[in-house]
Amino acid sequence: MSPLALVSVSDKKNIIPFCTELVEKFNYKILSSGGTAKHLMEAKIPVIKVADFTNSPEILGGRVKTLHPKIHGGILAKRTDEEHKKDIEAYDLELIELVVVNLYPFKKTVEKGSKWEDAIENIDIGGPSMIRSAAKNHKDVSVLVDPSQYQEFIEESKKGELKETYKAKLALEAFQHTADYDTAISNWIRKERGLQSSKYIESYPLIKTLRYGENPHQKAFWYGLNNIGWNSAEQLQGKELSYNNLLDLESALSTVLEFGYEEKDELTTETFASVILKHNNPCGASIGNSASQAFLNALKCDSVSAFGGIVAFNSNVDSETAINLKDIFLECVVAPSFDPEALEILKIKKNLRILKFSKDQIPNKNQTSTKSIMGGLLVQDTDNIEEKTESWITVTKKFPSTQDYLDLSFAWKICKHIKSNAIVIAKDQQTLGIGAGQMNRVGASKIALQAAKENGYGGVLASDGFFPFADTVELANEYGINSIIQPGGSIRDEESIEMCNLKGISMVFTNKRHFLH
């Protein structure tokens, strides 16, 4: 007796050659409905229509096609169970050996910004039911949910009876497929209706098993979305990305995105930006009138820490920039585009990872960030609030000069991406000194100011949190700081304001804090 395969797919990739092999090499009968049945019949593949098989028509505009005892009985029946055998005979059930189903393209539908009603109609009901039934009864039934599985199924079938371990793997992938589908639907409803969910559910496919985590003794895996973010970035050269590379690339790119992001020379001359990053903290950043100048200025801040670092650009990398990059040991360079001549120069360094991250691969701003804690997960909105400089308040008698204001804005954007407590000293829109990850603000200030002293004198100071005391202002004055930007909000703000007035320093409150842990 010929085995029966139920085939109902939205993604019709490779379905014709696959079903042809099922019929011609393994003597399968094909059971199908709707668009899939039509597609197969047009290719001259014999098909039994579901409506004929169940003796029940599609109803409710196609909403009900396969939700029928003849379908699910044929899938769920346990072949060796005596009670099931009686039902099989009593209800004349024909056993289904293979279920090939993938689902309505719900994710693609909502990504296009479809209407609520259109999205609802793209919620598959029959498909997940068949997949789950087959996966539950995987001892007797095989289930395929993705075209990438077809060839492996053919090869396994050539060996004879399918192994239980292979069928169990198919069942696992099937349940993960429906879980991912339901996650997409529930998250869409939550976002569309602005609802607070009682459960946090996300679904990310495995991209790659990494060599190790932060340290060689730690296992690590990379999960992500297929069409956006780092998985869609194009690696033009270099060894595979490590766990630490990915963390640093994320921080570097997030920082440089503060200044716009264009593949070609569409930026204004004031917004070519470069960031050098090490151990998840910027160690140098600058805006210049070219990518090359921005990089060289960023390098001046801390050329020692730049060794083995990550460099990010917000504009095209040309040959001049590549020449400046090639003499420094770097782990990765990321930019929206690279000139062919620049790539030739950079590829001389065989181990350098070169990544092209296009503008359209940047996720939208409505993202969340997560951190694992013992027994749980912390979830928050990403810190990507748009800063409105018109809401900033100068709280001192002295106002920042035009140049100081530009530097304050620049330093504030960089400070947001540095581990707290964070202090940034900047002048002419380049960092002179950075104090990161210190347990007190004065300690971070000392590190940043001392580094700045080696790179120049004066400039502005940015702090990611408020000043609990006036001591940071006093210290800043000793190093010639002209202006300060900070959130404000301390019960001792007046002390810091008075000290600024006494020392002739201007100070701006943003009313926004940017802690980063």
From Swiss-Prot:
Residue ranges of every copy of the MGS-like domain listed in the record: 1-145
Catalysed transformations (reactions): (6R)-10-formyltetrahydrofolate + 5-amino-1-(5-phospho-beta-D-ribosyl)imidazole-4-carboxamide = 5-formamido-1-(5-phospho-D-ribosyl)imidazole-4-carboxamide + (6S)-5,6,7,8-tetrahydrofolate; IMP + H2O = 5-formamido-1-(5-phospho-D-ribosyl)imidazole-4-carboxamide
Keyword NADP (UniProt): no
Short name of any one Pfam family annotated for the protein: AICARFT_IMPCHas
Keyword Chloroplast: no
PROSITE patterns: MGS
InterPro entries found in the cross-reference section: AICAR_Tfase_dup_dom_sf (IPR024051), Cytidine_deaminase-like (IPR016193), MGS-like_dom (IPR011607), MGS-like_dom_sf (IPR036914), PurH-like (IPR002695)
EC number(s) recorded for this UniProt protein: 2.1.2.3, 3.5.4.10
Family statement: Belongs to the PurH family.
Entry note about domains: The IMP cyclohydrolase activity resides in the N-terminal region.
Protein name: Bifunctional purine biosynthesis protein PurH
Origin species: Prochlorococcus marinus subsp. pastoris (strain CCMP1986 / NIES-2087 / MED4)
